[in-house]
A protein has these predicted regions:
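Helix-to-beta-strand junctions that scaffold the AdoMet/dcAdoMet cofactor pocket
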Residues: 1-3
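Conserved beta-strand edge residues that scaffold enzyme active sites
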Residues: 14-15, 80-82
Length: 119
């Protein structure tokens, strides 16, 4: 980014993965990825395709430290108690608001948004 340029990041809150009963993860980053193999893709068609994905989890402090390291200054940080996208194990609480089914009565952070500017 050029000085004064803006970065907008909207991501799943790392806390949400702690409640995944099928594949619990650690909150803090590890050198080894979580590996997941699934059939099909998120698009229509391609059901006969098998995809292996690697994921690394990053705590909020990891994300904020990485931004600071490259000269970004956070100007906004917000957390949301729902996801705009349904993941496995979620139910629709209101139109376009998905929450973990087993924790629907709790207000947990599902996503967060950060706006930062290049200093």
């Amino acid at each position: 980014l050029s000085p004064g340029g803006a970065l907008i990041l909207v991501e799943f809150h790392p806390l949400i993965w702690l409640f995944d009963q099928q594949a619990p993860v650690d909150y803090f980053h590890s050198a080894e990825p979580d590996v997941e193999t699934q059939k099909g893709t998120y698009t229509d068609g391609g059901e006969d395709v098998e995809i292996t994905s690697c994921y690394w989890d990053h705590s909020l402090s990891d994300v904020l430290a990485a931004m600071r390291k490259v000269g970004l200054e956070v100007t906004l940080f917000e957390e949301y108690d729902h996801s705009p996208y349904p993941l496995a194990g979620m139910v629709e609480r209101a139109p376009g608001e998905f929450v973990l089914a087993e924790r629907a009565q709790q207000r947990l952070p599902h996503c967060y948004a950060i706006r930062a500017r290049k200093v």
